[in-house]
């Protein structure tokens, strides 16, 4: 069998043309469509991965924000509760302090009223006593008594200490006017001369004097010049006594709050004694307990000693201890 090479070549060429046509018009569009679909699927998968990552990130952020919010809410709630508790305690303390201050103020007002009345009575009694004393001494002062006062004055003038004597002598010597000598009664001439001689001898100079009467100089004589003064009279004794009484009253006023505290402790100790019954050694225990309770009311910071009757143990046969009346 002979091979027709022309036919073979033609068939091969025809096959190649067919393959090219199939590839050009059939396979290539299909491949292009497949590639396009693969690219679209890849893009969709990439977009899905991106969205999934974004969703996960947003979820994590949301969870973190929720945790932070819960922590902040718990912190704010705890802070609000603590502030409410603090404010409640502050209001209670303010109310307690206000009540304590009001009670203390009322007690202080009562003590002040009692103290004022006591002071008024004491001062009135003191003034009356001194007024009566001055009037009685003024009525009893006679001319003979004034003469005796003159002798005492001249003696004390000579017995002056050097410093006071020098100051008075300088004032007498430099005075532009006569020195003033005052007495309750008008001095006789001989007594004036005695006083003049005593002054001249004491200060070694001729000192001009002016004698005058002054009812307030009770039973005494007074010499004054240029702001310097020397003398002796019963009025000075009364003034010294009055000053001593004033100091005694001031000391009593200072000690009065302590006495008030002791009075209240006595009262409280007696109440505790009545509540607990009469037992051996109960008085001292009651005193310490009463003092502790009273000090909580801020009545006094000082330590108060129990009275002797509270320190001693009460006898069983006695009806009640001598703690003292409130």
Swiss-Prot record:
CDD domains: ATP-synt_Fo_b. GO terms for cellular component: plasma membrane; proton-transporting ATP synthase complex. It is found in: Cell inner membrane. Residues 275-326 are annotated as: Disordered. Belongs to the ATPase B chain family. PANTHER family: ATP SYNTHASE SUBUNIT B', CHLOROPLASTIC. F(1)F(0) ATP synthase produces ATP from ADP in the presence of a proton or sodium gradient. F-type ATPases consist of two structural domains, F(1) containing the extramembraneous catalytic core and F(0) containing the membrane proton channel, linked together by a central stalk and a peripheral stalk. During catalysis, ATP synthesis in the catalytic domain of F(1) is coupled via a rotary mechanism of the central stalk subunits to proton translocation. This is ATP synthase subunit b 2. It comes from Albidiferax ferrireducens (strain ATCC BAA-621 / DSM 15236 / T118). The lineage of its organism: Bacteria, Pseudomonadati, Pseudomonadota, Betaproteobacteria, Burkholderiales.
């Amino acid at each position: 069998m002979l091979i027709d090479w022309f036919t073979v070549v033609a068939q091969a060429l025809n096959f190649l043309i067919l393959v090219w046509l199939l590839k050009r018009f059939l396979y290539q569009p299909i491949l292009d469509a497949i590639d396009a679909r693969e690219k679209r699927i890849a893009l969709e998968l990439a977009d899905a991965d991106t969205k999934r990552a974004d969703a996960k990130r947003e979820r994590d952020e949301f969870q973190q924000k929720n945790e932070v919010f819960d922590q902040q809410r718990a912190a704010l709630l705890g802070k609000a509760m603590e502030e409410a508790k603090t404010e409640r305690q502050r209001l209670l303390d303010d109310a307690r302090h206000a009540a304590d201050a009001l009670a203390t103020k009322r007690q202080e007002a009562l003590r002040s009223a009692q103290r004022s009345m006591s002071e008024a009575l004491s001062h009135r009694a003191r003034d009356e006593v001194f007024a009566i004393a001055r009037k009685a001494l003024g009525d009893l002062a006679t001319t003979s008594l004034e003469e005796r006062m003159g002798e005492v004055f001249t003696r004390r003038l000579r017995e002056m200490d050097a410093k006071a004597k020098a100051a008075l002598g300088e004032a007498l010597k430099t005075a532009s006017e006569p020195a003033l000598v005052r007495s309750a009664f008008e001095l006789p001439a001989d007594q004036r001369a005695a006083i003049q001689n005593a002054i001249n001898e004491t200060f070694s100079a001729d000192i001009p004097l002016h004698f005058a009467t002054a009812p307030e100089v009770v039973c005494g004589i007074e010499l004054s010049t240029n702001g310097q003064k020397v003398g002796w009279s019963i009025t000075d004794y009364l003034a010294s006594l009055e000053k001593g009484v004033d100091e005694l009253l001031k000391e009593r006023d200072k000690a009065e709050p302590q006495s008030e505290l002791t009075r209240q402790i006595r009262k409280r100790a007696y109440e505790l004694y009545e509540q607990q019954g009469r037992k051996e050694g109960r008085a001292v225990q009651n005193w310490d307990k009463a003092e502790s309770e009273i000090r909580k009311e801020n009545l006094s910071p000082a330590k108060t000693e129990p009275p002797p009757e509270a320190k001693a143990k009460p006898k069983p046969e006695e009806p009640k201890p001598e703690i003292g009346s409130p």
